[in-house]
Amino acid sequence: MKKIYTILLITLILNPANILVAEDTPIIVISAGKTLQSIDTVGSTIEVIDSEAINNSSYSMLGEVINEFSTSNNFFQTGGSGGNTAIQLRGLEKRYSTVYLDGVKMMDPSSPDGSFYLDNLTKNGIERVEILKGTQSSLYGSNAIGGTINIFTKKGEIGKHSDIEVETSSENTKNINYSFHGANKKFNYFIGLNKYLTDGISQMNDNDEKDMYRNDNIIGNFGYEVNDNFSIENSLRFADTFYEYDTVLKSRTDDGVSTDNIEFSNSLKLIHKKDNFKNTLSYNKLQIERYTTDYLGAKQNYFGHRDAFNYLGEYNLSLDNKIVYGVESELDASRM
């Protein structure tokens, strides 16, 4: 099944009271095209979870971190680590809350309603999360009635750095993070590697059978400044996960039901700035593969991918006064 969407966007953002903006004014990304706006002028309820809060959280999975620091949301998770995890905004169904990762629309074309679940997103390599509550349809499309969750990965900092972190806990759980990053005047990079492994617990009562979960993932973020006016940015994420779970049959306790997922997202941006103009041409890709095994040993495969081409132009009078225009074309496809 294939679907093609084309969207034209023309927006005028004017806030006369903020023609002059102090250098320390907090800014927030309010669209997948990364249009900057000071947080005080955002016309929606918004919550920002910064890198300090994410790093200090005792949770390893990003969905649980969001639930810890965000309010007035419906959070649900089926079973332990690896179980379906989602956040509902404004009390609406999950499909009415869109998720973006570095500008990539994370909607699974192979799922019945296109929903994307957060169960395979770990917190490693995540710089911040911005949650816009309330309808965002004009910026994000018709699915963003409840709101939008924008997730941004880390970028390299000046110099050369490396970090390693090892965590262990009950149920033979291990969480290993390693990252290296750096930057100079022309180039910046961040690469984060993560392995999460646990024996898990059973979703069913009255048995001690384990439902294991494994997550191997990598996050990469790269930027290169060709000259004073032109730069290139590329971010990617790859995750290979395996999850065992129980059927609804009470007579079965260790039935070998499992799902093996592969998720890949990539965003490539060409950015040109001159005077008050900024033009961004981007290509975003999402690919999801799911391999399921039922209690009889029968296997079923699901494939979904999304390709999007975006052009975003800005004429900036100031931080909060600008004209934004652009066009977007998407191709969704799925098969079994």
Predicted regions, residues:
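Outer-membrane beta-barrel pore domains and translocons
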Residues: G33, G134, F152, E165-E171, ...
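Non-catalytic regulatory/gating segments with a bias toward low-complexity or hydrophobic composition
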Residues: I54, I66, V129-E130, I149-I151, ...
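Membrane-embedded beta-strand positions in outer-membrane beta-barrel channels/transporters
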Residues: A86, R128, T148, H161-E165, ...
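N-terminal periplasmic "start-of-domain" segments of outer-membrane beta-barrel proteins
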Residues: I27-S57, A86
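Outer-membrane beta-barrel domain signature, strongest for Gram-negative TonB-dependent receptors
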Residues: Y213-D332
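Short acidic/polar hinge/loop motifs at secondary-structure boundaries
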Residues: K105-K133
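Periplasmic-side early beta-strands and strand-to-turn transitions of outer-membrane beta-barrels
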Residues: S138, N150, E157-G159, E167, ...
